[in-house]
A protein has these predicted regions:
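Cytoplasmic C-terminal tails of single-pass
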Residues: 492-498
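CN hydrolase (nitrilase-like) catalytic-core segments centered on the catalytic cysteine
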Residues: 90, 115, 256, 264-286, ...
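Soluble catalytic regions of membrane-associated enzymes that act on cell-envelope
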Residues: 196-322, 352-356, 362, 366-368, ...
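Short, conserved active-site loops that position catalytic residues or coordinate cofactors/metal ions
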Residues: 23-38, 56, 62-67, 214-215, ...
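Soluble or luminal CAZymes and related metallo-dependent hydrolases
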Residues: 13, 92, 162, 227-234, ...
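Membrane-embedded alpha-helical bundles of multi-pass enzymes
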Residues: 1-198, 396, 407-410, 422-424, ...
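Active-site catalytic loop in hydrolytic enzyme cores
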Residues: 72-81, 117, 126-154, 298-371, ...
């Protein structure tokens, strides 16, 4: 059986790797289309169980390449088990996708229904298990391509469906090139992409000058456990440099200063931070491990005002599994170095904070992968996205660029400028159309000072994105169910001789 399947296995392995190559730091977004063309060819004409197996191989090849940064992070102390283990678990979702595609492929316009069916597994991936792990969604690899403007209509789910559909349609046409009707979905996708307007970047509620302080962190992996004082000192030092540049007139005085995630640990009292804020005379948004009580610590963004100190804060809602919350500690002690730490307390309020005369929507690092966090903040009045992150744990691998791509997609999805403040890079300022105004390098102290537009108009994705996501997933599942029923009917007719 394996010998007979060898060409299909080779196709899905190559397809999984090509899907990974579509993601930043590379700009070859089109390899995702080739990846899904190969997947469609491999799944054509196979039974559901075999399609699930091929989908799993496709997914394992993708995640093994895409999550290599986990090996860079933990490999020295834990070997390949966390990296390979997570890749195997995540491969279960494309396995489900492959099975659903095999069912939906029995319908007319099969490539389109198949794309909806495959994308339905991303809906599940964002929710299960342990509240999901939505890393590596197809849409996040499209920030350099023509599909990106679709995010303003249907968010990441629509972008994913469009890319998968493009690959499936191309493969279906190549399988039967004499059937002109096979070109119809391809032409339709092209026309839709041409019709979608470029996201506007103009200000609707004035502008703000924002300073992003990247204090830097040592590239020491797990040694960061004991580097808290260094991170705080580095942020204070780079802020002092910023204050000197403002006083000398080298840069404009910002309206808002942003510090990255985990810049300090605090209970809201820190005289040195007070002095730094007072020296510039403008409010700060500071990423901090915030001691909210005797046993409660939040991963938070704190508004720090001149003269009055720490004020309102937002607590991270979507905590990193096995990092900020540890399930099954007796087992996971062999997979994560964070097992000795107490779980962070998750927040429950939307990520929106009043600061610098406006309302800022915020998500902290990993949360950017979830659709609802920034959507809720923007719907609650956020006119600017601020995304503090700490990528210092993961070295110089691709994790930083994968996360930055998510932030770029969210800017387009909500029609907002985005400010990414990273502890060790890459920090960035992003326009509402997803283009990068400025960014820093990795493992260097630096500060960005840029003027950003404030926008108030809500995109279709912000207003209706949740319903759109559920609708796409439901359509995919219904297509698979219809294909299953159609197959049952055909078998019934065959068995009765009808």
């Amino acid at each position: 059986m394996v010998k007979a399947l060898a060409p299909r296995i080779a196709a899905v392995v190559v397809g999984g790797v090509l899907l990974h190559l579509a993601f930043p730091p590379r700009t070859v977004w089109w390899t995702a289309i080739v990846a899904f063309a190969l997947l469609w060819w491999a799944l054509s004409g196979v039974r559901v169980r075999r399609a699930a197996w091929l989908g799993a191989v496709f997914g394992f090849a993708f995640y093994l390449a895409h999550l290599m940064w986990i090996q860079d992070f933990l490999g020295r102390d834990y070997g390949p088990f966390p990296w390979v283990g997570l890749s195997l678990v995540m491969a279960g979702f494309p396995a489900l996708g492959g099975a659903l595609v095999a069912l939906a492929a029995r319908l007319p316009a099969a490539p389109v229904w198949g794309a909806l069916a495959f994308a339905a597994q991303e809906w599940l991936q964002s929710r299960f298990p342990l509240n999901g792990f939505p890393w590596g969604r197809v849409a996040f690899g499209q920030v350099e391509g023509p599909f990106l403007p679709l995010a303003a209509i249907g968010g990441a789910p629509l972008v994913s469906v469009a890319v998968v559909a493009a690959g499936f349609c191309v493969a279906a046409f190549l399988q039967r090139p004499r059937r002109v009707v096979g070109l119809v979905p391809v032409v339709a996708i092209v026309l839709v992409l041409l019709a979608v307007p470029t996201p506007p970047v103009d200000a609707q509620d004035g502008t703000r000058t924002v300073a992003v302080v990247q204090g830097n962190a040592p590239d020491i992996g797990l040694g960061l456990f004991s580097a808290g004082r260094t991170l705080r000192a580095n942020s204070l030092a780079e802020t002092s440099v910023l204050a000197d540049r403002v006083r000398s007139g080298a840069v404009a005085r910002p309206d808002l200063v942003v510090w990255p995630e985990s810049s300090l640990s605090t209970d809201g009292v820190d005289p040195a931070v007070d002095r730094a804020v007072d020296a510039l005379g403008v409010p700060f948004l500071i990423g901090a491990n915030y001691e909210a009580g005797a046993t409660d610590t939040e991963n938070a963004v704190v508004v720090w005002n001149p003269g009055t100190g720490a004020g309102e804060r937002y607590a991270k809602q979507e905590l990193v599994p096995f990092g900020e919350r540890i399930p099954l500690r007796a087992v996971t002690q062999y997979l994560t170095p964070f097992v000795a730490l107490a779980d962070f307390t998750p927040g429950t309020a939307p990520g929106v904070l009043p600061v610098a005369g406006t309302r800022v929507a915020t998500a902290i690092c990993y949360e950017t992968a979830y659709d609802h966090v920034l959507r809720d903040g923007v719907a609650d009045g956020g006119s600017l996205l601020v995304i503090p992150t700490n990528n210092a744990w993961y070295g110089r691998g691709e994790m930083t660029w994968q996360h930055l791509a998510m932030s770029r997609l969210r800017a387009v999805e909500h029609g907002r400028a985005a400010v990414v403040a990273a502890l060790s890079g890459a920090s960035a300022v992003i326009r509402p159309d997803g283009s990068v105004v400025a960014r820093t390098g990795l493992y260097t102290a630096d500060t960005l000072v840029e003027q950003v537009p404030l926008r108030t108009e809500l995109t279709f994705a912000t207003r209706w994105g949740a319903w759109f996501e559920h609708g796409l997933a439901l359509a995919g599942l219904l297509a698979a169910a219809a294909g299953y029923l159609l197959r049952r009917r055909e078998l019934s007719r065959t068995s009765t001789g009808a």
